[in-house]
Amino acid sequence: LGVELPRFYVVAADLYPIAGIVSQEDFSVDELSNYLDQANSAVLRAAAKDFGNVVSVCRHADYQEVLAAFRDAGGLEPEAKRKLAARAWQYLAAYEATVAQYLSPAGTLLDDEVVMSLRKVSELEYGENRHQRAAFYALSGARPSGLNAARLHSGPWLNFNHYLDLDTAFELALEFEEPVCAVCKHDKPSAVCALPSQADCLRGALAADPAGAVGGTAAFNRQVEAEAAALLLETFVESVVAPGYSPEALKILRSREGLRVLSLPAPVLSPHELELRSISGGVLIEAKDNRLFHADPACVTRRKPTEAEAASLLLAWKTVKYAKTYAAVIAEGRTVLSVSASGSSSYDAVRAAVWHLRDRRPILPGAGPLVLAADAALPLKTLKAALAGGASAVIQPGGWQDDEDCVRLCDERGATMLFAGIRHFRH
């Protein structure tokens, strides 16, 4: 047309806050097209493409920096333009990934191509160690769930290791239908007790492993009442998590300085939740281990477990699922007495569990039969160590070449053994 249009030097554009919109409880997929901002997206994309000549700004937080650069120097340096362009591309990618995540059916994260958008929930003081940076992220656009939905009632902000302990402890507590207290430390169970009285659950867990409670996390699957709260004040537990707290319990717990008190009413897990682990050169993704058994465990010995043994075996099996492999758990009645984790072999794990038990009560016998759960199939030598340690009932995955010999040994010793038919490795 013979008209020379001026060039754009700065393009400032943002998009609908799609993550906040689709995460609303009453949002419907039919409304999504109203918030797909194609015009601004195209303009920002074009500006970011021509980053050598055009300054692309997608965050309000960058406005003052850009204005100051034009005011003081007449423009931005090439490096600053590239930085802003990269931020724009990241912004666009996160926007589109959020839409893709929202529209995708559950369980598609194992497709050939995976696009994921994460938003920062909180900056953490440090990672596993003080020299490591860390932050807590959640899926962009997802409705708050799990620890992202937790409410901190009292105490300092959480660090990286607190999140790990809280996740393990509360997941373990939610495995139980009856009242339970699970104490975890360093991302593994220390003690678990399931009794009708919540206060007795806490007493049992603390008595089983007093050292494990120091700096650990106590999780409950019921609203915490005043009696249990008063007992917690006498411990060195660092964090408490439960579905809720009575007003009196919350008042008591808030009186202890430094105690982190969290409520987490929503279930930690969704049926389709996945686990991601970074490795050199890539990321491993797997479905979460949400299954306790494939089917009812099979009793493979002549003697069947008594009612008390069966209850103890189930308690121990739920606990060993959350201990690091190789793991062994010894329980008595409704209390886990010893947890051995991260053994280099199942034999070492069982021997360590027996040693810990004897170290804590070297003389007096217990009130009931001891049971042992192992997360991996047991060779004959390992089973011998378990029975020699006092176990009268064992639950293990089965499927080892020594299975028949193990059954024969249990029958000779009058012990009972269940094959769970599923293993629970955890690394």
Where are these regions (language model features)?
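Active-site loop-to-helix "anion-binding N-cap" substructures in soluble metabolic enzymes
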Residues: 1-107, 196, 222, 228
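ATP-dependent carboxylate/acyl-activation modules
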Residues: 3-13, 17, 95-427
